């Protein structure tokens, strides 16, 4: 594994331990060069309460690896989380920089009604 990925995974592990200590529901985000994924995971870490990604049929028709797609995923995850009764979450960016697609997803989720 290269050094850049090891550093990202180390940051992600540290963040997840901190969120687990808080005992709150988390919005976990993962990205690949082509897609972006978001999950709302229960406080005990055992259940996915809502999920959205660029693989969803409603979002798949457009481009999937850009900021516009991440914004749509953010709005969709906020809508689905609110439908599941979740309004307050901790943002787990999986060690990725808070920039670009990650930031766009987070901003759209906030506008959709999720509190970080």
UniProtKB/Swiss-Prot annotation:
GO molecular function: 5S rRNA binding; structural constituent of ribosome
Keyword rRNA-binding (UniProt): yes
Keyword Cytoplasm applies: no
SUPFAM superfamilies for the chain: Translational machinery components
InterPro entries linked to this entry: Ribosomal_uL18_bac-type, Ribosomal_uL18_bac/euk
Gene Ontology biological-process entries: translation
Pfam families assigned to the protein according to its UniProt record, in alphabetical order: Ribosomal_L18p
One GO location term (cellular component): cytosolic large ribosomal subunit
Keywords: Ribonucleoprotein, Ribosomal protein, RNA-binding, rRNA-binding
S-S pairs: none
N-terminal signal peptide: none
PANTHER family in the cross-refs: 39S RIBOSOMAL PROTEIN L18, MITOCHONDRIAL, LARGE RIBOSOMAL SUBUNIT PROTEIN UL18M
Family under the similarity heading: Belongs to the universal ribosomal protein uL18 family.
Subunit text: Part of the 50S ribosomal subunit; part of the 5S rRNA/L5/L18/L25 subcomplex. Contacts the 5S and 23S rRNAs.
Functional note: This is one of the proteins that bind and probably mediate the attachment of the 5S RNA into the large ribosomal subunit, where it forms part of the central protuberance.
Entry protein name: Large ribosomal subunit protein uL18
Organism name: Acinetobacter baumannii (strain SDF)
